[in-house]
Amino acid sequence: MLPSSIQISGEPLSGAEVRDICRGLRDNAVRLLSLRGCRLCDRDFGRICRALAGATSLAQLNLNLGVVSSPSRIKQLAEALRTNRSIQSLFLHGSPLTDAGLALLNPALALHPALVALDLGDCMLGDEAINLICGLLPPDGAKSGLKELTLSANPGITPKGWSRLAIAVAHSSQVRVLNLDYNPLGDHVAGMLAVAVASSRTLEVLDLEGTGLTNQSAQTLLDMVENYPTALRSLVLAENSISPELQQQICDLLSEGEEEEEMAGGAADTQEWGRGREPAAHQRGGSSWKCPSDPNSQMVLMTSGLGDSLLAETEM
């Protein structure tokens, strides 16, 4: 039997449902497990963690929106991840991890051989967490390093922390998707990120929606896109104080670069973005940016789900 998906959202889990989930994990019949916003007792959470520890078919685990709600649950998840070898995408968006909680998880994350996509958006992280995350980016032996990283809505991270992340992305990472939306970055941090993008050989998607940018940083990003060949294909700048004209210019340049790649036969296969990642703001919908001068043209910038697309590549 081919592995299937279990997706439950915002519901209290009964004992019978937990037993079915654990049975599916133990039988290696589950490829995707999503329990976003579900309510369950500590005992049942522990049962699921013990089952996923030995699961060999599980590739995506979504525990967004407060499922990992206490230090004891963080420890149980860390213990499961130390044993598990199959999970490629881990979503913990909206979990009250804090720096201390990520420190508990980090050893398991750092040693996991398959993990390529990590969502730590809205997890109450600060600079100490950034220090740990930077260590997850570069390849290490058989590990490929993270290819998708989401850090949306973590306002406790300071410019010092963001500068450290920018250096890590530029220097040794394999990151293809970087979601930093709804953080108070400002123009100074955006300038450092522009340098990181110009240096990176892999970064394709950068989400800076609602990050306090102005025309100053937009001009820097425009210069970067115009003058330096990069892998960047999608740049999200919505909900910033940036003129429509500058947004249009950046949009046009990114579109031109993609067209040139396609004409040369070097464009990568279209990735299937948007599955698994939570909106950074509770009221927020899809992250898309329409080029201002053409209401019919749209550059779709849903910037998640890389783990799924990588799974598809593996299965082909």
UniProtKB/Swiss-Prot annotation:
Q: Does the keyword Disulfide bond apply?
A: no
Q: Which UniProt keywords apply?
A: Leucine-rich repeat, Repeat
Respond yes or no to whether keyword Repeat is given for this record: yes
Q: Which Gene3D superfamilies match?
A: Ribonuclease Inhibitor (3.80.10.10)
LRR repeats span 57-78, 86-106, 114-137, 145-166, 174-187, 202-223, 231-250
Q: Which InterPro entries match?
A: LRR-containing_regulator, LRR_dom_sf
Sequence ranges of Basic and acidic residues compositional bias: 272-281
Record region (Disordered): 257-296
What is the recorded name of this protein?
A: Leucine-rich repeat-containing protein 73
The species this protein belongs to is Rattus norvegicus
